[in-house]
Amino acid sequence: MRADMHLGAGDPGALERLLAAETGARERALVEAWRRHGWRWARTDPLGLAPRDRDPALDADDAPWLGPLREALERIYAGPIGWETGHVHDPEKRAWLAAAAETGAGPAPGERERAAWLLAATERFEAATLTRLPTAKTFSLDGAEGFMVLADAVIRRAAAAEAVVGGMHRGRIAQMALLFGKPMRRLTAELKGAPDLPQSLGAASDVPYHLGWRGTREDGLAVRVLPHPSHLSIVAPVAAGIARGTPGALPLMLHTDAAIAGQGVNFELMQLSGLAPYSVGGTIHLVLDNRVGFTTDAAAARTSRGPADVARAVEAPILHVNGEDPDACLRAAAVAVDWRARFGSDVVLVLTAYRRRGHNEIDEPRFTQPVMQTAIDARPRLGAAYAARHALSPDLAAFEAEMDAAFKAAPATPNDGGDAPGLAPDAAARMLAAPETGLAEDRLRALLARLGAEPEGLALHPKAAKFLARRRAMAAGEAPADWAAAEALAFASLLAEGSPVRFSGQDSVRGAFSQRHLVLSDQGDGRRVSVLDGFGARAEVFDTPLIENAVLGFEYGLSVADPRRLVVWETQFGDFLNVFQPVFDQFVTGGEDRWLMTSNLTLMLPHGWDGGGPDHSTGHLERVLARCAKANLRVVNASTPANWFHLLRGQVHGPLRKPMVAFTPKALLRHPGCLSPLSEMGAG
């Protein structure tokens, strides 16, 4: 395919000159029709099986004098990239996307050589694993090698401090070897059955295609590939949280068509993407669309036209790319990275390709997709075709020698495991040993007085003013501290010591029971002031959307990335565990044992028989306890404000980083018998 087939009209200024000559309404209408609907007529399916839909608007005006303009637009918008951007309403963004589609240059020097090498190396690696390990599940990328070019180009162009990758099964092993820098010998050892962690650690570990990796590529770019469970998309919010806690990170999410369309956590994460507390500067989503999920055809897998239609809700542009056009992959990657740099928001690239081997190496795809598989069998190898087209000869000698040595090596424990004190035999005893969390009483009084001070010039609600007055009375020794005061003291004291605090939850800033008031509102102009500002380290205090699964995953990921920070998330009621159970099971309670991921996340589940019905009143203590094993979790039910103060501070000052689930009270928040003198929060 000629380079000019997807670079404007072969001339970056061609369309501008055509429009400059004819600027009437009919010309503009034709251009707008192609910009909005042309992607449905683009040649993005290499098999030619997906139906193409030519919108009537593209041919509504058949005036002969519009012919040159129509031809130019068809070359731009009906080529190997489908520009699905009509749902983007911001005028500046629309103009930017139109310019990106209608102008541009060919691949930069060296890009085609790199692409040709990647295609050839991927084909060799996939062939070697099939020949040498015929029963190993690698979820081959055979038939979708263009995805390697796409992902590699994104990482290279972004050149971020670290690419944080939430991945997928498809092509996982090849990506580790060729994109992410995992040592080949270690990969093959894991495929042969060697544990990825020393047995002396006592860790459960996982199958090879679930494992993560953190290292440096040959070009010096750092990558962090998150481990994931078979519930694939649940890793995406975890990766996003880690990206937020990693300065200069690039969040890169890899999806397959069935997963991004079918798993609701993807929509949840996109709903978070434009909210300031969850901002990561834009996530680049790469979707591998094989038009089949395991054995399920696309027609049975989703109602939407495309797999990534969830992105339309947040007006993220969606570029559809022909998986057999590496030059189109390079261009789409450049557009995605530049979009993120310009607008700091999400963008989606959908690469349409196919699976030569079915779902995995022991699958028989002809049982369910015989027509598709016949078309696949007729396709030539992309690597050889691309190299021949551009007269390139990739040198694979060093790669093949390394690969051959790795496959011949005897399986051995490939990892020294590093430091894992949370899995040591004495972990439970260390968790039960109370750290020093108390503070001098005069220090507590000073902090509490600041927490009770009325912000200058703020017209308070009368009940909020009384709330602060009670705080000042506690600071003066006229009354013991209630639950909310002890909690605020824990936060303020950590901030003063230099530990950042991130407290969030569903209606939690005020408190679902009006007990907290961490942010005060001016009754006249609505101005808001956080009572935790100015104590030292950064305090984040905010309400979260009515989203449990993605929010918990994000908060967990952030706690993994930043061990200095106290991360606390509160559900509105404890039974909301029902909705976040997947990320709780897979990561919060199982992340350390499987993947050595440590976290001090604190999860608050309001719990108690207070007239809410049998389910709405419970945090399901039995389910949480069922997930406890090998000292993986703190489960607490504090009975006094002082208990709660020490528990929160212990999450920062304790000897081991462990998640804590707190079954927090409702009736006790204002119970006259549930008060603590400041002396109970003292040292010793």
Where are these regions (language model features)?
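Glycine-rich ThDP/TPP pyrophosphate-binding loop and its adjacent helix/strand module
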Residues: 150, 226-412, 575, 610-612, ...
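Conserved pre-catalytic core of RNA-dependent polymerases
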Residues: 88-148, 152-207, 509, 516, ...
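Extended, charge-enriched "interface" segments that sit outside catalytic cores
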Residues: 2-148
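Cofactor-binding active-site loop characterized by glycine-rich and histidine/acidic residues
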Residues: 161-164, 168-315, 319, 513-562
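Active-site cores of enzymes that catalyze phosphoryl transfer or operate on phosphate-rich substrates
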Residues: 104-126, 188-240, 244, 638, ...
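Hard-cation-handling environments
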Residues: 393-501
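ASCE RecA-like P-loop NTPase motor cores
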Residues: 495, 509, 527-684
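Conserved phosphate/anionic-ligand binding catalytic regions in large, soluble enzymes, centered on
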Residues: 31-46, 149, 153-179, 236, ...
